[in-house]
Amino acid sequence: MTEPRMMRLGVFLSGSGGNMASWRHPSAVPDGAVNLKYFQGLTRKAEDAKLDFVFFGDGLYISEKSHPNFLVRFEPLTLLAALAMDTTNIGLAATLSTTYSDPYTVARQFSSVDHLSNGRAGWNIVTSPLEGSAANYNKPEHPQHDLRYRMAGEFVEITKGLWDSWEDDAFVRDKESGVFIDPEKLHRLDHKGEFFNVQGPLNISRSKQGSPVLIQAGSSEAGRGFASKVADAIFTGQATRADATAFYKDVKQRATSAGRNPSEVLILPGCGPIVGDTPEEAEAKYQEIANLVVIDDALNYLGRYFNDMDFSPYDLDAPFPELGDFGRNGWESTTDKIKQLAKDENLSLREMALRSTTPRNEFIGTPAQVANSMQAWFENGAADGFMLNNSVLPQGFNDFVD
């Protein structure tokens, strides 16, 4: 008998919340991004609420215009190791770049976290959209978008091979016979590829999962192709159910074409629920968040998608400027959507900046309204679950869970 399909839920824990001005909210913890006790409390709450996982993003470049939660934050795998000691069942996932890391180190790091957490680690595989990252890693320039995905494909192939360095029962550890390992169950990788040469084997035994859950976040053509071949779960950001349904269908078909079972490739759109006892209360909470955003911060937030572009010289109330292909080497799918939305709705620069900073979605309302919207996406081919990304933490998450 087929088991019933279950909605999967994770929560993106990003300091004071996803909104650029969230740290100013009365309920916010302004230093949340570097406050271990704060993250421990939120993670325990997520575990008690039976969520599947918590997630921590990362980036490798900042400027004075960056999101406050990005200006100062923990290195995420270190944080996962700490949270593993404080939780029992919930999955622990984090971002790590394939463009500015090496496969052997990444394989060790995630295998270690998987051991420490007793098989609860997840890796959000990114290729690093921020072009300024290159200068922090002794690189002359940021690789082109499609090249980064080619590198990522080989990178993940290597890490998966390294995680299979040892068979499950390779470590005998027999004191009487003096046999520590069975050498027949040790496998050296000897990978020689386009971008990497890695000998192996990995110097840690197979973890409980064998490998972490592999996650990918990207909606570009290259991102979809990559995710459909390697990801167990895909984070995506479609704003409407129609767009989410089209994405869902496309990626499931790609997974099938890649020889995979599409039901094992989970599509998890972002969901920013704002919950109130009445629709009016929920709307008031949205407006309270939106009113915290000043236009300069909104322009900075928008600019980060366009390689930290300075929009201040432009007329705020003129139509959104024509930018051509600018931004596509970083956030390709996101910048394409911004440009298309501005064109379709004839938005001014001011309107586009404010909308991008505090987007309105289908998940604002009473508990029943939000639950019904999520169920509609889940039951109609738009989602296998959701990544909760609350505008303000901890209030937004508490409202949703409670």
Indicate where each model-derived feature is located.
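Hydrophobic faces of well-ordered beta-strands that scaffold small-molecule active sites
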Residues: 7-11, 54-56, 90-96, 119-125, ...
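Conserved, mostly hydrophobic/aromatic
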Residues: 9, 46, 50, 83, ...
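Short, acidic/polar
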Residues: 32-46, 106, 216-226, 288, ...
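Hydrophobic or amphipathic alpha-helical targeting/insertion segments
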Residues: 86, 91-137, 143-146, 151-155
